UniProtKB/Swiss-Prot annotation:
Domain statement: Consists of an N-terminal domain, which is sufficient for the localization to the septal ring and is required for cell division, followed by a linker domain, and a C-terminal domain, which forms the translocation motor involved in chromosome segregation. The C-terminal domain can be further subdivided into alpha, beta and gamma subdomains. The alpha and beta subdomains form the DNA pump, and the gamma subdomain is a regulatory subdomain.
Subcellular locations according to the entry: Cell membrane
Source organism, top-level taxon: Bacteria
InterPro entries: AAA+_ATPase (IPR003593), FtsK/SpoIIIE/SftA (IPR050206), FtsK_alpha (IPR041027), FtsK_dom (IPR002543), Ftsk_gamma (IPR018541), P-loop_NTPase (IPR027417), WH-like_DNA-bd_sf (IPR036388), WH_DNA-bd_sf (IPR036390)
Protein name: DNA translocase FtsK
Origin species: Streptococcus pneumoniae (strain ATCC BAA-255 / R6)
Amino acid sequence: MANKNTSTTRRRPSKAELERKEAIQRMLISLGIAILLIFAAFKLGAAGITLYNLIRLLVGSLAYLAIFGLLIYLFFFKWIRKQEGLLSGFFTIFAGLLLIFEAYLVWKYGLDKSVLKGTMAQVVTDLTGFRTTSFAGGGLIGVALYIPTAFLFSNIGTYFIGSILILVGSLLVSPWSVYDIAEFFSRGFAKWWEGHERRKEERFVKQEEKARQKAEKEARLEQEETEKALLDLPPVDMETGEILTEEAVQNLPPIPEEKWVEPEIILPQAELKFPEQEDDSDDEDVQVDFSAKEALEYKLPSLQLFAPDKPKDQSKEKKIVRENIKILEATFASFGIKVTVERAEIGPSVTKYEVKPAVGVRVNRISNLSDDLALALAAKDVRIEAPIPGKSLIGIEVPNSDIATVSFRELWEQSQTKAENFLEIPLGKAVNGTARAFDLSKMPHLLVAGSTGSGKSVAVNGIIASILMKARPDQVKFMMVDPKMVELSVYNDIPHLLIPVVTNPRKASKALQKVVDEMENRYELFAKVGVRNIAGFNAKVEEFNSQSEYKQIPLPFIVVIVDELADLMMVASKEVEDAIIRLGQKARAAGIHMILATQRPSVDVISGLIKANVPSRVAFAVSSGTDSRTILDENGAEKLLGRGDMLFKPIDENHPVRLQGSFISDDDVERIVNFIKTQADADYDESFDPGEVSENEGEFSDGDAGGDPLFEEAKSLVIETQKASASMIQRRLSVGFNRATRLMEELEIAGVIGPAEGTKPRKVLQQ
């Protein structure tokens, strides 16, 4: 029988078993070190005292702090390693304390020339005698830090350097940055200064009031003394000048009583004429008819009407930003692109990382990585601004985990707009947290577009509220068009409205035409007076009022607000577009400005002519890059969050700016509207009233109930050409297909053309 060679094979341990074994070893070593540190901390026996003195030899009198820190690290090392800046901050603070303790030891025992020997002597004495009584300074590590520091900055300077290290370490450990602390102190100083100025003004007002009361009291006393002196004088005969006796005074005849009649006050009427302006025109005179009015006792709304701002805690974002910086650099490195993140700005809704590419890196390589960056950062979407205007950096905008709401009150307090500029409006906060405002008179018209629920209507309400906060009814007038009937109807009956909010789309085109007529009237007025714009005319009025007793009223600005342009374009596209184009071309100098809002940013609503005449645009979140290009002529709006954030592209900038719009609640709007209604009643201007329209008038635009106003022109065209087709009428009369079809039906009813015969052309019955 052959002997079988039996061999035992040892199974290799798996990776999990090795890791478990290493973990057990680490745990046992950590437990042993922890036990030794506890013996040293409580100085248990000769071993504990010896261990404590050995630690003192290294770190001096900071041994307890070192033991406590080591114990925490042994038990929580996994959590500590994840906290960026915690270890480095602790070591920086510890180094500062070592410097200060060692400097104090040198000063106390006069160890200027023998720092090392003196420090060793303090610890060795206790070590050999099993004591822990003497002060050990900063130990050997403290000596190593103290000697070069004292050589450079002296013993006193060492205290200063140690304090700086403690401060820097505290900043590294804390969740706040230097910018946050500086901003905190600057805000505190600003509040203190504001309170100081307010108290100073109050003291000045009180002093003025006291001085006024004192002057009034002195004048009253002086008047009483004068009256008393006059009463003491004897009566005098007015004809002879002789002093009358008491008997003569009693014999004077009684004075007959007369009824007092209230005088009739006649308000003067005058035309505004300037003597230096000569009228050489042979045209019909243009009457400048402004009746003088009494000063309007009107109080502007206060910020107290709006809900106070709730504090926002974005400390969590700072921790995420530090992690994202590492992820960004690692992601770019994985694609072979070398970049450095220069800085990160935390905004209300997004954080902007400013990235500097290395020399030779093409910008489009970074721009094409937006989806990969969104994947790496686990972000909803990433918007890349390449490059940042005015900087040699590329901006990467990443949504925040928590969006901080910007309240209307907060934005208004930070914007610091000029009170005399009624149309300077705060729009939102930029990524760096600064408030951004725009001047509507310079835009001069604004297009606001975005999908449903993206914040468009809230932004329009914020713009209206901003104007109402600064302007009286005689300074700014509104014409509001709201086909949805729910967005702007709350503003009905405020004194700033020219007419009630227009909710009928059929009336809207007529209302816009009334504004066009007002624009033409104003230009005729400017030509009559000899000025170029509304500012020049109002300056003339002010000059005239200062020189004449007949007071004239300056022209108010007119702001036309259309909340849903798409509805108007569906009903009367040609008339609405013509009115918008005319206003866009000429209305700026006349003081008339438009704000057009739509939730359907397509080319049939925002036509090329409208875009050409409304150069300033605001884009909220849209569904596609096509819609973004329709609004802004470039992509970007499809990357927005849809939480009130927007891309603002004013007329004077080539690239859009990302802003977080302010939130104004319905309660805030109602409070400011109710306050304004208590100040003055609505005073509508009948000249802007579009009047009543019939059911089919909107279909025929400017026509009456009897038919289309182009009927006669279409009839002449058909008889002249002896051809009748909807496409010909549509092409020759520049009307839509639906209107051309209705004209064909009217021509058939009138007997001009025959009925349709399938694919054959209609017969023309009249010659």
